[in-house]
Amino acid sequence: MKNSKISFLCLLLLAPARLLAQAEMPGTDPWTLGSVDPAALMVQRIGIDLERRLAEAPGKRTYATREEANSLTKKKARLAEILGVVDPRTGTGPVEVVSPLGSGQIEANGFSIHAVRWPVLPRLDGEGLLLEPKVPSGQTAIVLGDADELPEALIGLIPGSETKAARLRGLAQSGTRVFVVAMIDRRDENSGSRVIGRFTNQPHREFVYRMAYEMGRHVIGYEIQRVLGLVDALVRQDEKQTISLWGWGEGGVVALPAAALDVRIAKVGLSGSFSPRERVWSEPIYRNVWNYVSEFGDAGTATLLGNRGLVVSNEAGPKIDGPPKPKSGRSGAAPGKLGAYEETKVLAQFQLAMQKRIPEAKNAEWVFGATDGVVWEQMFGPTPQVKSEPTMSQPLDLVAKAYRRHDRLMDQLCDHVQLLWNRGDRTRMGAFNGNALAQSGNWDRETQILRQDFHNQVIGNLGQPEGVPTKRARSRKIYDTPDFVGWEVEMDLPVAPGVFAKGVFLMPKGIKKGEKRPVVVCQHGLEGRPHDVANPLQKTNYYNSFAAELARKGYIVFAPQNPYIGQDLFRVLQRKANPIGLSLFSYITAQHRVVLDWLKTLPEVDSSRLAFYGLSYGGKTAMRVPAILKDYCLSICSADFNEWIGKNVAREPWGNYTSYMYTGEYEMVEFNLGNTFNYAEMAWLIAPRPFMVERGHNDGVGIDPMVAWEYAKIREVYGRLKIPDNTEIEFFLGGHEILGMGTFAFLKKHLKYPE
């Protein structure tokens, strides 16, 4: 919490000299971190480890050329999965002409212009503009501009993209049907809800991304669906036409995987988008795709084109300095910038794709050029550049109408995600089949596969360490009270060289030789430190020094330092982790495993009684880590338990609580969590071990009905397992804080201490 640094400073000032003696704990080596801030160093080291893994990822990637014959099909299915292209399209309906352009006919030399719409998913359409040649050649081009380019600008109806407009008009004049698809842009006017009167400065693409990512969808994937829905409609009309796809900037980010997934697209051209993706974490968050760098990268995606054409232009893409500036009532957007890619790196990525493509594609036409002018003819053949302006039969306010179209398309995406959220409970139950498992009598065994899926597919597994720690834990004494002694302890993390686990260890005095006591691992929250929970000299805000209080009662306590500290310095860790299939909790889980292994070596510790108790972000840890690490014999979630998926995706949250759609905590979303594990399902992975929720009525993290709704599903499963006493919830009149009443009784009951 915010007062953590001040609290620790007061501790140093007020404590007698003997508390600050540097004596290490028996069985450990002396403290080596000196006066450096361990939490800041931890975050820094994790960042270094992630950048190393990102750099190594392309070299460890597998490609279709090195796998079995049907690997293209498997890889396409996997690419569709991580991009959220998983909903069956309607498969019916034509491209239809709609107003406003239909009511104000626009004619040009050799072609006419129409506003068009086509079906994609139920209650979700694609829209754009069509340049219809008067003498068609049988060629069709689908064009995606950069996110901030209106289709009207791309064809020259309004200023802004004159060079591109000249090329597209020339293409239409030469007989090619040109469809310019409307994209979700980077403004923020519609990023929020007029119903509840809350808004953010998140770009529209980020606003859609946040809610969609949690439900296993993606703004990129939705736009791929719109492209492929258009292809569906065109092919129904004429199976023999040749369809090409071109994308500029953000449009290129969509065009490459769209073409990779659909063989009906004969050729794809990309401008200002094709690049290495190892630094995607520094770009806008709506480009974040789970495991994309590990499994694909742009080179790997290009290989899925097989023997179809690819044209890459290294013309500079969009330059974006960040999200819209925060202003009153609008804040919370994630940082991220876009700029030109180095030509040598783009060319190297192109050459990697050339090298890795399947043998049958060796003769496919793949072209790289420095600018659009160099490669445009390679893509479309000789075409004129038509700079004359089309004429309109009546004036139209095209910009205002274009923005209304944009908001309509964006609202459809948001509505689709809200529908997925409403259906998510049924989806998760179908996968988990909790009631049937409860009746099977093999709960622990049957849930092991789900536990592995949670670790590997949702949290991200760092894997097994390459060896045991080569160094012992290091420590220094920081507390010496009448009831207990405290040390800061640091230990290596073998699975991530250079990264360490660290915390405060409290050992009660008076433990008899041969006596073994339970341990309670007490976890701080956001921007917190172990001293917030373990400080014996003052009653800390929110935490009420609950770790120190437990130590006074005779429990052995360990208070870990978790790496969610430093604002964007830690949030960017999630950005670096996701592209290689990891998350912040990948490291937290590994750190807790090391801590537990160390605790089990201590002669005073009963390794069968290792409990977890965390507040706020520590409550998030209480849901995730014990679900994976079965060495924890019980878990208590305080000031965090929720209908977690709704808290992340609700555009119009009910009740007065904090929804992550409207905060700067952009690291909260976890890919496809909404279809796999809400808090009930996480608690089911903890079962049959004891599990408890501590909930203050005034805690703004949620509202009581939401908390009770989600908890009821847990209580039902424990009841069906015939262990209803193993789970409890305590509501109390208070806020975001540790109460330490029912929870302390819960610890005493299940740890059987004090006797």
What do these predicted ranges mean?
Residues Q22-G126, P136, F207-E223, L228-D232, ...:
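Alpha/beta-hydrolase-fold serine-hydrolase catalytic core, especially in secreted/extracellular enzymes
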Residues L9, L19-L20:
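Cleavable N-terminal signal peptides
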Residues G138-V235, S273-Y286, K512-T601, N648-N656:
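Cap/lid segment of the alpha/beta-hydrolase catalytic domain
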Residues G229-L304, D597-E665, F671-N672:
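Primarily recognizes the serine-hydrolase "nucleophile elbow" in alpha/beta-hydrolase
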Residues A182, S271-G272, S313, Q561, ...:
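Alpha/beta-hydrolase-fold catalytic nucleophile elbow
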Residues G138-Q139, S174-R177, K240-T242, V263-K267, ...:
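Loop/turn elements at helix/coil->beta-strand transitions in domains of secreted/extracellular proteins
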Residues M1-F8:
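Bacterial N-terminal signal peptides that target proteins for export
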